Amino acid sequence: MQVSVETTQGLGRRVTITIAADSIETAVKSELVNVAKKVRIDGFRKGKVPMNIVAQRYGASVRQDVLGDLMSRNFIDAIIKEKINPAGAPTYVPGEYKLGEDFTYSVEFEVYPEVELQGLEAIEVEKPIVEVTDADVDGMLDTLRKQQATWKEKDGAVEAEDRVTIDFTGSVDGEEFEGGKASDFVLAMGQGRMIPGFEDGIKGHKAGEEFTIDVTFPEEYHAENLKGKAAKFAINLKKVEERELPELTAEFIKRFGVEDGSVEGLRAEVRKNMERELKSAIRNRVKSQAIEGLVKANDIDVPAALIDSEIDVLRRQAAQRFGGNEKQALELPRELFEEQAKRRVVVGLLLGEVIRTNELKADEERVKGLIEEMASAYEDPKEVIEFYSKNKELMDNMRNVALEEQAAEAVLAKAKVTEKETTFNELMNQQA
């Protein structure tokens, strides 16, 4: 076997391999012997068919199969010998084959980039310092009450957290536009669902009033024909409602799994959940900064084959989220996923190098802790932990999470880490 390797472009490689004619003939004869032992031909007993008849009937197909097998095996031998690490599936380009002559073919593929990590000492990471305060717990209790609130119609003017039922008709330069009209539209104030100025124009009005508000569509608005345009909305305010928050009764509290129904028990449970969320948020915030710094400090080439593979993964995930099938997934435009796919590949390659250079392996105690932390959010944590322990795929996924965290910590060990005090709400809003 003769082998030559050349660089085509960037990470592209072409391996050219020549297989000696006698090697091909030896392999063909060997395979024909195997075929002769199995075939049945009228007039002959099984295994007793003369080789010339076997060769006449099966020679062409056997030779084709043998060539394919030799191409594959010789390519594998070549990349092992040349210490080449292909990324993605190779493309075989067969040359012209002539009976009794050496056979030359080429294989084109991409290789993984050679990554030499640099700039880790210059990475800057800001670690949030946060405590869950009594005021934070009070705020979460208010949120829980709002989620369980009922609505009561009122006669007064619209206020910041009321709910309104309206008819509206929008126009630009006196012309109504598509999507600018609705009847019996229910709008909860303060949630930012409408364009700036819309809710402000409704506040202070009462049910039964009809009025017009002036707004301007944002420059980044999704509809091209409305970007930056001044508009008028004719409003018919049909109903105003205010929230009625439930009292913290034993019955209400027990809905959240606090068996004794006490306010103290609910506060303790809420605080525990908030502290679990906080721990995860801090960890994710620090890890994301470390990874972002790693990416900025290391500009690497990325094999197109890996990006294509990641795009397919993202397509399928998107299709599953929206109830699509495999065919619909592959029809989604690759442009929607290209940037995200490239970043995921870059991060994977860089973290892989961190793991390799630091000889990291998933810490089983960390894996156990991650599973327990995740399971604590469920009604029966023991059941969730047991389910994970019996599912190899889930356990492997959690080991990958642990290994990624360990890699991020290895980056952090060399980075410039500063601490910054912040609040629970500020941190959680950054995560959103």
From Swiss-Prot:
Coiled coil regions in record: none
Disulfide bond residue pairs: none
PPIase FKBP-type domain residues: 161-246
Pfam families: FKBP_C, Trigger_C, Trigger_N
Enzyme class: isomerase
Domain of life: Bacteria
GO CC annotation, single: cytoplasm
GO BP of this protein: 'de novo' cotranslational protein folding; cell division; chaperone-mediated protein folding; protein transport; protein unfolding
Keywords from the UniProt entry: Cell cycle, Cell division, Chaperone, Cytoplasm, Isomerase, Rotamase
InterPro entries: PPIase_dom_sf, PPIase_FKBP_dom, Trig_fac, Trigger_fac_C, Trigger_fac_C_sf, Trigger_fac_ribosome-bd_bac, Trigger_fac_ribosome-bd_sf, Trigger_fact/SurA_dom_sf
GO molecular function, one term: ribosome binding
Reactions listed under catalytic activity: [protein]-peptidylproline (omega=180) = [protein]-peptidylproline (omega=0)
Assigned EC number: 5.2.1.8
Family note: Belongs to the FKBP-type PPIase family. Tig subfamily.
Cross-referenced NCBIfam families: tig (TIGR00115)
Summary of the function given for this chain in its UniProt record: Involved in protein export. Acts as a chaperone by maintaining the newly synthesized protein in an open conformation. Functions as a peptidyl-prolyl cis-trans isomerase.
Free-text note on domains in this protein's UniProt record: Consists of 3 domains; the N-terminus binds the ribosome, the middle domain has PPIase activity, while the C-terminus has intrinsic chaperone activity on its own.
Subunit structure: Homodimer and monomer. In vivo most of the ribosomes are in complex with monomeric TF. Uncomplexed TF, however, is in a monomer-dimer equilibrium with approximately two thirds of TF existing in a dimeric state.
Protein name, as recorded: Trigger factor
Lineage, uppermost ranks: Bacteria, Pseudomonadati, Pseudomonadota, Gammaproteobacteria, Enterobacterales
